[in-house]
Amino acid sequence: MTIIRKKHPLIKIINHSFIDLPTPSNISSWWNFGSLLGLCLIIQILTGLFLAMHYTSDTATAFSSVAHICRDVNYGWLIRYMHANGASMFFICLFLHVGRGIYYGSYNMIETWNMGIILLFAVMATAFMGYVLPWGQMSFWGATVITNLLSAIPYIGTTLVEWIWGGFSVDKATLTRFFAFHFILPFIITALVLVHLLFLHETGSNNPTGLNSDADKIPFHPYYTIKDFLGVLILLMAFMILTLFFPDILGDPDNYTPANPLNTPPHIKPEWYFLFAYAILRSIPNKLGGVLALILSILILALMPFLHTSKQRTLTFRPITQTMYWILVADLLILTWVGGQPVEHPFIIIGQTASIAYFTIIVILMPMAGMIENNILDLD
């Protein structure tokens, strides 16, 4: 078996990636999320495939087809709720994975990090288009509001929006193309994941100390396969509790009402995992400014390698920057909460303050804290 594992042209690629991969001996459970994201992607592709067998991407029948899946298809309700809540689990793992990358300075592996940012954008685009497909009230109005943001682009904005819509409003053409894109994107994401792993295996994994671990590597299997398996069990446990006991807790009740272009819901808001970005978008009164802030809220991650001022890679031994990091986490939770609130006092000012704090912490305070720590430790 060893000979096949190491010699076979196809199997040896898997061997070098998941079995004999030299891995730092001290990586913690925070390094589990890569494999958990892979599991989430597989779950989403499989459940999505079975949903696509019964779904119809037509404005007249889309809502009914989803109801039909839940009522008449064998275990259709389970497949539908696994797919909907699988997206939430996906984003929880994504945010924790990115948070780990920021905390332990993994952004210094620039190619892997940039690939991860592209993946994040791709997953967000996929989730947004998936939310439109059930053709409920929030699907329709969410699609209308978010696509309309492109009209803020000077000169070509309006033309671009109508081109994406395939008409003068969100209608049948929009739904059909969103379904097509929603179907193809996960496979593109899978390809990008392989590139992400390729870049990662060029440099090897980071570790909690941020030090070079070449002298202390162990094989991925059995040590980290068993460790990842524990993470898988915990994720599946949480996932099934969410799906079977509280399937609608993260959804919007408005989406159980069929889409009606003549009736605007009182509060249009996206799914919970977009609320932090939505809060940043809403905090700027100018339309174009809001759109730019929205894009920058994610794109700012690409600046992280260039904003790294410390002589140490991770935050493990850097209490000042650690404090800034956890304030940033709290700030993101505040933004997520505010994004789901109506646009009125005091939520407007809270959102604006939290948005300013978000960019200030990343661009100014964390780099400054890094320099202060260098001075304290005489690392200059």
Swiss-Prot record:
Superkingdom, taxonomy of origin: Eukaryota
Residue ranges crossing the lipid bilayer per the database entry: 33-53, 77-98, 113-133, 178-198, 226-246, 288-308, 320-340, 347-367
GO cellular component: mitochondrial inner membrane; respiratory chain complex III
Locations listed in the record: Mitochondrion inner membrane
Binding residue positions for a ubiquinone: 201
Gene3D superfamilies: Cytochrome Bc1 Complex, Chain C (1.20.810.10)
One example of a Gene Ontology biological process annotation: mitochondrial electron transport, ubiquinol to cytochrome c
Keyword annotations: Electron transport, Heme, Iron, Membrane, Metal-binding, Mitochondrion, Mitochondrion inner membrane, Respiratory chain, Transmembrane, Transmembrane helix, Transport, Ubiquinone
Single GO MF annotation: ubiquinol-cytochrome-c reductase activity
Note: Heme 1 (or BL or b562) is low-potential and absorbs at about 562 nm, and heme 2 (or BH or b566) is high-potential and absorbs at about 566 nm.
Family according to the record: Belongs to the cytochrome b family.
Function: Component of the ubiquinol-cytochrome c reductase complex (complex III or cytochrome b-c1 complex) that is part of the mitochondrial respiratory chain. The b-c1 complex mediates electron transfer from ubiquinol to cytochrome c. Contributes to the generation of a proton gradient across the mitochondrial membrane that is then used for ATP synthesis.
Protein's name in the database: Cytochrome b
Organism of origin: Microtus chrotorrhinus
